[in-house]
């Protein structure tokens, strides 16, 4: 009876199969943990947003509330600095190699907060940055040269005209859809203004008319803008065609809201950038090897 205890203890020793199973389970858990960390790293390596708009606060607000900005939320200017200066958790931003982030200063001409100064942090490639910083004299001199004659080349000629004719129905459909979308948003914003912010007489007179005439108004506007965009994209050169084809809605909704005095109803805001002499001067003083993270227009 005394020798039975060690025999039982020897029978309880883990077999090699149990050890291999435990090692396999541990390996699976380790791989699962690595895959989870890999997924987290991929989430952290999300591409940086292409652009962000920072609204400049008034000097009176900044002078009256300095303590609140220190103890509470940070001002939007600091958020813009963090957007430019600090990378993600893994220390690397996922952005193209030939692009850089610059700060463009402009004024909102149409849309919400009209007349306010804004700082736009946007991604620009080297080519786009060179076009943006091109001096005015060069652009003015290049315009008459392009108008002298319809030159034929790889980027301009009859083949481009043929291509624009083929794309005419496609541009019409795309412009119709985009105009329908922005027009519906504009109509809804105008309806909310007359229904919630205006007087009772506006509510009983204008709101029913907006609802009744919505199908006619939206179809007329979308069809007209689609036809205009399809005709306007006919061009002799690729560059002019691309500029016209990318502008589907032609800024009609913003223009209409500004004419009606309802800038807040615009589905977008149009920002007019300041002169590009500052950024061209800053880049000319820098070495080509040196990277420019922030520039001012």
From Swiss-Prot:
- Predominantly, its location class is membrane
Q: Which GO terms describe its cellular component?
A: membrane
Note the superkingdom of the native organism: Eukaryota
Composition skew (Low complexity), residue ranges = 22-31
Transmembrane ranges, per UniProt, are 160-180, 211-231
Which UniProt keyword terms apply here? Answer: Membrane, Transmembrane, Transmembrane helix
Biased composition regions of type Acidic residues, renumbered to the chain:
61-70, 78-88
Q: Which organism is it from?
A: Mus musculus
Note down the stretches annotated as region Disordered. 1-88
Give one Pfam hit by family name.
TMEM169
Q: Where is the signal peptide?
A: none
Name the InterPro entries on file.
Answer: TMEM169
Topology Extracellular: residue spans: 1-159, 232-297
Cytoplasmic topological segments = 181-210
This protein is called Transmembrane protein 169
Q: How does it sit in the membrane?
A: Multi-pass membrane protein
Q: Where in the cell is it found?
A: Membrane
Q: What is the lineage of its organism?
A: Eukaryota, Metazoa, Chordata, Craniata, Vertebrata
């Amino acid at each position: 009876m005394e020798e039975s205890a060690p025999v039982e203890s020897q029978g309880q020793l883990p077999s090699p199969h149990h050890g291999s199973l435990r090692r396999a389970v541990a390996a699976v858990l380790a791989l699962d943990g690595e895959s989870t960390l890999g997924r987290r790293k991929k989430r952290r390596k999300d591409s940086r947003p292409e652009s962000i708009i920072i609204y400049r606060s008034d000097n009176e607000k900044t002078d009256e509330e300095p303590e609140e900005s220190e103890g509470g939320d940070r001002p939007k200017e600091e958020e813009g600095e963090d957007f430019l200066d600090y990378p993600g958790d893994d220390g690397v931003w996922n952005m193209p190699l030939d692009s850089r982030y610059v700060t463009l200063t402009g004024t909102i001409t149409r849309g919400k907060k009209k007349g306010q100064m804004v700082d736009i942090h946007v991604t620009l490639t080297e080519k786009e940055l060179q076009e943006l910083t091109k001096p005015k004299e060069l652009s003015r001199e290049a315009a008459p040269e392009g108008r002298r004659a319809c030159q034929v080349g790889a980027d301009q000629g009859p083949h481009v005209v043929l291509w624009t004719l083929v794309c005419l129905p496609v541009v019409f459909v795309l412009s119709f859809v985009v105009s329908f979308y922005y027009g519906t948003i504009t109509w809804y914003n105008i309806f909310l203004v007359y229904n919630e912010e205006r007087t009772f007489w506006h509510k009983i007179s204008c709101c029913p008319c907006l609802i009744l005439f919505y199908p006619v108004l939206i179809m007329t506007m979308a069809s007209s803008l689609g036809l205009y965009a399809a005709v306007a994209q006919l061009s002799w050169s690729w560059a002019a065609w691309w500029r016209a084809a990318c502008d589907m809605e032609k800024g009609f909704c913003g223009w209409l809201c500004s004419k009606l005095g309802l800038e807040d109803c615009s589905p977008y805001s149009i920002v007019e950038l300041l002169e590009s002499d500052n950024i061209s001067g800053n880049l000319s003083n820098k070495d080509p090897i040196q990277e420019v993270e922030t520039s001012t227009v």
